[in-house]
C-alpha cells in the first residue's frame, strides 16, 4: 500500500508483461483481482458496476485488470480472501464484506476456471466481526474509523448461477 513503485511494478507492469506473453502463445490468463476495486459505499457490487478503488492496492489491481481485459482469452476473479486461521486479534463490526478462506475459494475457482470475463468470488456477506467470531472465539470488536469502506461486499449472483451448472 505504501510502496507505490513496487505496486506499479508488480501489479501493473508485471501483469502487462504476462498478458503480452499469453497473447503471443495464445494461452488463457486467469487474473486474481480484489473487491477493493469497488468504491465500498453501497455494497452488493456486480461485476459490471462502476469501479473506483479507495486505496493504492485497489488502483494497482484495477490498472492490471485493464491490461487483462484487453486480452479476450482471460478470466478476472474479483475476490475477498483472508488467511486461515483468522490471524487478527480484532475485527470490524461496521465493515461488511465477503471474506472467504483460500481453501474454499479454490473449490469454487476449479468449477469456473473455463469461463471468461469477470467473476466475483467470495463468501457470505457479513461484517468482518461476524465472520471472525465463527473461527476465533476470543476476537475483539473494533469500529473502523475509515480504514476500510463500510460496504465492500460483492454480489455473488453470477458465480452462484455458474455453479448451478455443476
Predicted regions and their residues:
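NAD(P)H-binding glycine-rich loop region in Rossmannoid oxidoreductase-like domains
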Residues: 1-10, 21-23
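Conserved Rossmann-fold NAD(P)-dependent oxidoreductase catalytic core, especially the SDR/UDP-sugar
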Residues: 16-52
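Structural signature of the Rossmann-like NAD(P)-dependent dehydrogenase/reductase core
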Residues: 29-33, 75-78, 98, 120
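Active-site Tyr-X1-5-Lys
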Residues: 52-80
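Short-chain dehydrogenase/reductase
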Residues: 8, 12, 49-62, 95-103, ...
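Substrate-positioning beta->alpha
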Residues: 79-114
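Mid/C-terminal beta-alpha module of Rossmann-like enzyme folds, strongest
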Residues: 108-154
Amino acid at each position: 500500500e505504501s510502496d507505490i513503485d513496487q505496486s506499479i511494478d508488480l501489479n501493473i507492469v508485471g501483469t502487462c508483461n504476462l498478458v503480452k506473453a499469453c497473447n503471443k502463445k495464445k494461452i488463457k490468463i486467469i487474473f486474481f483481482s480484489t473487491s477493493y476495486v469497488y468504491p465500498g459505499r453501497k455494497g452488493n457490487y456486480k461485476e459490471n458496476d462502476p469501479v473506483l478503488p479507495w486505496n493504492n492496492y485497489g488502483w494497482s489491481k484495477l490498472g492490471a485488470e485493464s491490461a487483462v481485459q484487453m486480452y479476450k482469452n482471460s478470466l478476472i476473479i474479483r475476490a475477498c480472501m483472508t488467511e486461515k486461521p483468522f490471524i487478527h486479534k480484532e475485527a470490524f463490526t461496521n465493515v461488511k464484506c465477503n471474506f472467504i478462506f483460500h481453501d474454499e475459494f479454490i473449490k469454487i475457482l476449479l468449477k469456473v476456471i473455463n469461463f471468461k470475463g469477470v467473476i466475483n468470488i467470495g463468501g457470505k456477506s457479513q461484517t468482518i466481526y461476524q465472520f471472525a467470531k465463527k473461527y476465533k472465539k476470543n476476537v475483539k470488536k473494533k469500529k473502523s474509523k475509515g480504514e476500510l469502506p463500510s460496504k465492500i461486499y460483492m454480489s455473488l449472483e453470477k458465480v452462484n448461477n455458474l455453479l448451478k451448472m455443476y
